[in-house]
Curated annotation (Swiss-Prot):
Protein's name in the database: Major facilitator-type transporter psiT2
UniProt entry keywords in alphabetical sequence: Glycoprotein, Membrane, Transmembrane, Transmembrane helix, Transport
Gene Ontology cellular component annotations, sorted alphabetically: membrane
Glycan-modified residues: N269, N410
Taxonomic classification: Eukaryota, Fungi, Dikarya, Basidiomycota, Agaricomycotina
Pfam families attached to this UniProt entry: MFS_1 (PF07690)
Organism expressing this protein natively: Psilocybe cubensis (Psychedelic mushroom)
Family indicated by similarity: Belongs to the major facilitator superfamily. TCR/Tet family.
């Protein structure tokens, strides 16, 4: 039969040729359709910049305190002049910020699910800026606590930013946008501590530039005022570029726009191609309108989801351990070598945190996108949690290292010891910043498991779990550190044993995320 076809007359050859041509065209269409499906959704740069500015305000409101908060508390006089008691009070200041955040997260998240993201986020960010500046004018410990609580109440809008990211992205651009969003935290934690460590007591350090009476009377006002100015710029940028992303409001806006322009569009689409495009667009929009408007799920219903519960539980350990590493590191560096610390000045502490932020920034920019595209997200999350036991174990080695070259007479370190100490701190900071990848992954896991109509509430639940950990973490971790050093338990290193144990429990808890997400995918 094949031989007969090869010797057939022209009509059959023409038929075969047409068939081959049609097949080629069909294959080309399939390739084009496949490429369209795989094409990455364009990233709205204006929107991305708007949410970056909003999130950076919350980060800077906290990061600028780390280098000088212990010295600030000591100068206020609440610790009775004993540096070993500073840790408890400085931890309390950091805790009340998170406590205020816990109290407002649910209310602000639910409110944003009803009235929109912008009306809640922009005023909250502006309020944080004001209370951040006022903190530098504190003259009593009570005033410090009050201002931090007020700022924390407004910082409860953090999950709204997470929801905006989820609503702006899809599966085609998640691996790029989420690491970029996660880049905000290390950038903020690089800039904030640098501002705090450099500008505290600016009138004394730089009398020719900041030698004003205001900065002499309030030596911690300038490092609080600069983040406030940056926040005001961020709010202004967000006001003009951050658009509403709440799905129900976006759909209502599109429906109104379509109704207004339906008559003009019908007249303009007179050609066959235009009419076809109009019919296709109308069909898609009608299908979107016919999609039922599901109400947001309640808190109880979301908590019943095993995936949400696993992310909440593991997120609690993640935030507790991550915050503990920063709190203890700051206190560890502030404490004198003979008291069980490293004995660095606030300026050097600020530089250390800035370097840590730069390391995290490079990881988020260069490594995280590739990791998210290559490996399973739940397994990467578990890997990040596994780094915490090593972080605290290595941190406990800094004081013994410093003691090898410490002169009790001159209160100085030998140059060789100083070099080794800085090298160890660099390795520690590099290892600690590996954990940063877990935060954007947690947000992506919430998006995978939560209903889109309840996204802000689901993010709020996870954020509440994390914020509760951050509320109690500074007080607990700093108290454990102070107790172990003041009572010289295990040579002042009892806190290392406690933190390593908690880290191992967190590692075990993170294994549940991989199990529940795999189970949910199989359903």
């Amino acid at each position: 039969m094949s031989l007969e076809r090869s010797t057939s007359p022209n009509p059959t050859e023409r038929t075969s040729l047409l068939s081959d041509t049609a097949s080629t065209i069909s294959s080309r269409d399939d390739v084009e359709q496949s490429s369209l499906k795989q094409r990455r959704t364009p990233i709205p740069t204006g929107q991305l910049g708007g949410k970056v500015s909003m999130h950076s305000i919350i980060i800077n409101a906290e990061g600028h305190l780390w280098p000088y908060i212990n010295q600030f508390v000591n100068d206020i006089g609440v610790s009775d002049g004993n540096p070993r008691n500073v840790g408890f009070y400085s931890g309390l200041i950091e805790s009340v910020f998170a406590c205020g955040e816990v109290c407002s997260i649910f209310m602000l998240s639910r409110l944003s699910d009803r009235i929109g993201r912008r009306p809640v986020l922009l005023p909250s960010a502006l309020g944080i800026a004001v209370f951040t500046a006022l903190f530098g004018l504190s003259s009593s410990f009570t005033m410090m606590l009050t201002l931090r609580v007020c700022a924390g109440l407004l910082a409860g809008a953090t999950p709204i930013v997470h929801s905006i990211v989820s609503e702006l992205t899809d599966d085609t651009n998640n691996a790029l946008v989420v690491p970029l969003y996660g880049l905000i935290t290390p950038i903020g934690f690089a800039i904030g501590p640098l501002i705090g460590g450099t500008l505290e007591h600016a009138a004394t350090k730089y009398p020719n530039v900041f030698g004003y009476e205001l900065f002499r009377k309030y030596p911690y006002f300038l490092p609080s005022f600069v983040p406030c100015c940056m926040a005001i710029v961020g709010v202004t940028f967000g006001y003009f570029f951050l658009k509403e992303t709440l799905p129900s409001l976006v759909k209502s806006k599109k429906r109104l726009e379509r109704q207004r322009s339906s008559s003009s569009i019908s007249s303009e689409n007179s050609t066959l191609y235009g009419a076809t495009e109009h019919i296709r667009d109308s069909t898609e929009e009608t299908a979107a309108d016919e999609e039922p408007d599901s109400k947001p799920k309640g808190i109880t219903e979301l908590i019943r989801d095993p995936s949400i519960r696993a992310i909440m539980a593991s997120g609690t350990f993640l935030m507790f351990l991550y915050t503990s590493s920063d709190v203890i590191f700051s206190l560890y560096c502030f404490t004198a070598v003979e008291d069980g610390g490293v004995g660095l000045p606030p300026e050097k502490i600020g530089y250390a945190f800035s370097v840590a932020g730069l390391i995290a920034m490079l990881m988020q920019l260069c490594i995280t996108p590739w990791v998210l595209r290559t490996f399973d997200k739940a397994k990467v999350y578990h890997f990040c949690m596994c780094s915490f036991p090593l972080v605290f174990a290595l941190m406990g080695c800094l004081n013994p290292l410093a003691q090898t070259g410490y002169s009790e007479i001159n209160k100085t370190l030998h140059p060789t010891t100083t070099g080794l100490l800085y090298a160890a701190i660099a390795i520690l900071l590099l290892l600690a910043r590996v954990c940063v990848m877990a935060f954007p992954i947690s947000m992506m896991l919430v998006k995978q498991t939560a209903d889109k109509h309840s996204l802000a509430t689901a993010n709020g639940l996870v954020q509440v779990a994390m914020t509760l950990a951050r509320a109690f973490c500074p007080t607990i971790s700093s108290s454990v550190f102070a107790y172990s050093t003041s009572h010289n338990i295990l040579g002042g290193h009892f806190w290392v044993v406690v933190m390593v144990f908690i880290s191992l429990v967190g590692v075990w808890q993170s294994t549940k995320i991989a199990r529940v997400t795999k189970t949910k995918e199989q359903l």
